C-alpha cells in the first residue's frame, strides 16, 4: 500500500457506518358518491262534468337537501429511535441514560518519548492529527474516564474545525502560542488553559519536560461551568442492532502521517483493531494493553501551514 499523508480518525464505537432512514408517507384519499332522486310524474285525467268550479290554489313545496362530507385522518409513520451513547453509538439498555456531562477533549503527546500514553483506550473517540514532524492525539471522553490522562500537550488552530461538532467541549491542553491561545479563547470551547486552571495539572513520572504533564478526567470534568448546556449530541449514524455494515473486508491499513508510520491490524480475538507506530506495538500505560479500537476511519486531506 503506497503511503499517503492522511489524517486518521479513530472511533471507539461498537458500530459505525452511514445509515439510510426510509420514511413512508401514506396518503389516504376519501371519495364521495353522489346519488339522485327520481321524481314521480302524474298525468291527470279530466272529464267534463256539471259542477261549480272551485277556485284553484297553488301550494309551493320546498325540499331541503343535507350534504355530509367525511375527511380521512392523516396517517403518520413514526420511525423508532434507538437510544445510544452519543459518541460511541453503543445502544443503551432500557432506563439507562448517557452521562449528563459535556465532551472532554484532551490533547495527548505522541512523541516517542511520550509513549506509552495514558488514556487512549478509555476515550470514546481519538483523533490523530499531523503536527510538526509527527502527530498528536485529541482524545475525546464522555462515557469513560482515565486516571491519569496524558502526557498533555499544546493545541492547534485546526482543533477548532476538527472538534467543532462536539457541542462546546471542555478543552484540556498545555497552552499554545499567543495566536493559538486567542483562537481557542474566542471559540466555543470551554478553555481549560493551565494559566486559568493551574490546579488541574501536574508534572509526574520520570520523563523529561514537556512530556510529563498530566491530569485526570475526573478533575477536568469537575471544571465544567455550571451553566453548560450538557452532553454532546449524536455525532454519527450507526447501523441498527443485528444489521451488518457494508464495504469490503480488509485486515490491515498502513500509512504515513508526516514522520510517523501507522499500522492498524484486525484481530479476530478482540474483534477489533490493534495499533503499531513506527514498527512497534503501541500500548496504553494504564492497562499495559495495546492501543485498540472497534472502528478506524482514515481521512486523506490536505495540510497547509497555519497562520498561527
Where are these regions (language model features)?
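Residue-level detector of alpha-helical hydrophobic segments embedded in or interacting with membranes
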Residues: 1, 43, 50, 69, ...
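Generic low-polarity alpha-helical segments
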Residues: 1, 25, 64-66, 297-298
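Sec-dependent bacterial lipoprotein signal peptides
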Residues: 1-30
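Short linear motifs in intrinsically disordered/low-complexity regions
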Residues: 3, 38-42, 290, 296
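Hydrophobic multi-pass inner-membrane translocation pores used for secretion
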Residues: 9, 30-31, 46, 71
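Bacterial signal peptide processing site
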Residues: 32-36
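Extracellular mucin-like PTS domains
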Residues: 41-80
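A surface/extracellular/periplasmic glyco- and lipid-processing/surface-interacting theme
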Residues: 77-127, 132-308
Amino acid at each position: 500500500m503506497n503511503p499517503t499523508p492522511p489524517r486518521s480518525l479513530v472511533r471507539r464505537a461498537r458500530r459505525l457506518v452511514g445509515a439510510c432512514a426510509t420514511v413512508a408517507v401514506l396518503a389516504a384519499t376519501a371519495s364521495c358518491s353522489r346519488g339522485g332522486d327520481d321524481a314521480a310524474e302524474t298525468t291527470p285525467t279530466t272529464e267534463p262534468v256539471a259542477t261549480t268550479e272551485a277556485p284553484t290554489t297553488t301550494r309551493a313545496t320546498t325540499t331541503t337537501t343535507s350534504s355530509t362530507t367525511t375527511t380521512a385522518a392523516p396517517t403518520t409513520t413514526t420511525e423508532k429511535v434507538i437510544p445510544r451513547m452519543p459518541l460511541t453509538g453503543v445502544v443503551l439498555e432500557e432506563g439507562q441514560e448517557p452521562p449528563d456531562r459535556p465532551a472532554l477533549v484532551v490533547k495527548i503527546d505522541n512523541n516517542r518519548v511520550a509513549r506509552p500514553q495514558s488514556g487512549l483506550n478509555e476515550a470514546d473517540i481519538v483523533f490523530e492529527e499531523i503536527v510538526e514532524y509527527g502527530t498528536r492525539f485529541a482524545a475525546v471522553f464522555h462515557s469513560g474516564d482515565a486516571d491519569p490522562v496524558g502526557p498533555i500537550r499544546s493545541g492547534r488552530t485546526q482543533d477548532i474545525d476538527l472538534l467543532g461538532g462536539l457541542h462546546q467541549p471542555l478543552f484540556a491542553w498545555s497552552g499554545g502560542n499567543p495566536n493559538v491561545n486567542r483562537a481557542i479563547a474566542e471559540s466555543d470551547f470551554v478553555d481549560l488553559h493551565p494559566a486559568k486552571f493551574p490546579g488541574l495539572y501536574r508534572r509526574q513520572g520520570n520523563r523529561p519536560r514537556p512530556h510529563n504533564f498530566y491530569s485526570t478526567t475526573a478533575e477536568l470534568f469537575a471544571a465544567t461551568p455550571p451553566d453548560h448546556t450538557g452532553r454532546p449530541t449524536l455525532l454519527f449514524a450507526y447501523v441498527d442492532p443485528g444489521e451488518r455494515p457494508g464495504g469490503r473486508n480488509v485486515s490491515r491499513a498502513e500509512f504515513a502521517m508526516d514522520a510517523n508510520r501507522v499500522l492498524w491490524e484486525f484481530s479476530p480475538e478482540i474483534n477489533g483493531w490493534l495499533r503499531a507506530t513506527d514498527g512497534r506495538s503501541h500500548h496504553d500505560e494504564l492497562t499495559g494493553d495495546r492501543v485498540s479500537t472497534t472502528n478506524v476511519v482514515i481521512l486523506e486531506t490536505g495540510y497547509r501551514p497555519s497562520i498561527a
